[in-house]
Amino acid sequence: MFVDQVKIYVKAGNGGDGMVAFRREKFVPNGGPAGGDGGKGADVVFVVDEGLRTLVDFRFKRIFKAEHGEHGMSKSMHGRGAEDLVVKVPQGTIVKDIDTGEIIADLVAHGQRAVIAKAGRGGRGNKRFATPANPAPELSENGEPGQERNVQLELKVLADVGLVGFPSVGKSTLLSVVSAARPKIAAYHFTTIVPNLGMVDAGDGRSFVMADLPGLIEGASQGVGLGHQFLRHIERTRVIVHVIDMSGSEGRVPYEDYMAINNELEQYNLRLMERPQIIVANKMDMPEAEENLKEFKTKIAEDIPVFPISAVTKTGLRELLLAIADKLETTPEFPLNEILEQEDEDTVLYKYIAEEPDFEITREPDGTFVLSGTKIERLFTMTNFERDASISRFARQLRAMGVDEALRKRGAKDGDIVRLLDYEFEFMD
């Protein structure tokens, strides 16, 4: 499979901090708490744009950071939420988390959206914590940190046009003269063993992706040579360009080559023959090519287009490229297996996700107890340690989660050091 890959870093926006404030207005005694909530940060969202064909843009920009939410304000005013950072990607992009190997998203349809990095929610202001027992709380929350990830983008590049033909008929040479692709070219068979892709400009503002695929031989549909590898590539294309050596320079008969290739395509997948074919009579600059072309045309249907060219002398190329572009405009995508696709649409996939514990405790060689876990780390980062009331609330939350009891069971005693992220504190029994 011809795959474009690139690694990037994404960071969603942090939530804004909540505020501790009180209402102080003339003639309003005991105004009460009036600290607003912080705004939500911005998600990093990938959106499919059918106009994009490659991941080349990501090779010049690899870091994407979304904006943070605004902090809460006095007079119970909430901070503004940040607008999502929208990143456009081509159809067929797969997004993987590099650290876990998880497939985050498989983006296949135009306009499809996926949140790649989730923003942090805004912290609550002190107005949210008012209770009858504590009508004037002096505590607030920090904004939740936004998610950050190192991700790998993989694009299974879908070629619009596939060049088919026996080895050494001139497929690589043709691709090299109509695009910026530079495939290996030599006068021996199987020079091309992996697909080469080129972006082709038809010369009238239209463009398409052409693939020079490994040479096909008889028996390919049964896996002979590079058969199955070749045919898996060609089934993803919309138009097949059949390149034939019309000079017969290696003792081959053009019409027999034409029939043999089509036979392999038909045996591998009947639907391959539904794709429109354009026949390219290559090497027309060679002796006997004209005579062979006349004989060839008498053996095929009159409505099958044949374009005589010479990839070496670059003659006949413009007419060929315009014809390919015209054919692409009227050719839809070909589903490989409609029954399978219908079954996929009706199938619900249930995935088991193990429940993550609230916290875990480990002990280092120096005796330090280390707390970790998504929930406990989120509580820590959202605690405003500049306020005594917030610190007391954090201690109560740990106690309610069972952290104190779990530390005692692990042997923690008064004065032992407990670490959570970069913060260390003493255990008090």
Curated annotation (Swiss-Prot):
InterPro entries reported for this sequence: G_OBG, GTP-bd, GTP-bd_Obg/CgtA, GTP-bd_prot_GTP1/OBG_C_sf, GTP1-OBG_CS, GTP1_OBG_dom, GTP1_OBG_dom_sf, OBG_GTPase
Gene Ontology CC: cytoplasm
Binding site for GTP: 165-172, 190-194, 212-215, 282-285, 310-312
Keyword flag Cytoplasm: yes
Region (Disordered): 124-145
Residue ranges constituting the OBG-type G domain according to the UniProt record: 159-329
Binding-site residues, Mg(2+): 172, 192
Protein keywords: Cytoplasm, GTP-binding, Hydrolase, Magnesium, Metal-binding, Nucleotide-binding
Entry function: An essential GTPase which binds GTP, GDP and possibly (p)ppGpp with moderate affinity, with high nucleotide exchange rates and a fairly low GTP hydrolysis rate. Plays a role in control of the cell cycle, stress response, ribosome biogenesis and in those bacteria that undergo differentiation, in morphogenesis control.
Subunit structure: Monomer.
Family recorded in the similarity comment: Belongs to the TRAFAC class OBG-HflX-like GTPase superfamily. OBG GTPase family.
Protein name from the UniProt record: GTPase Obg
Gene name tied to this protein: obg
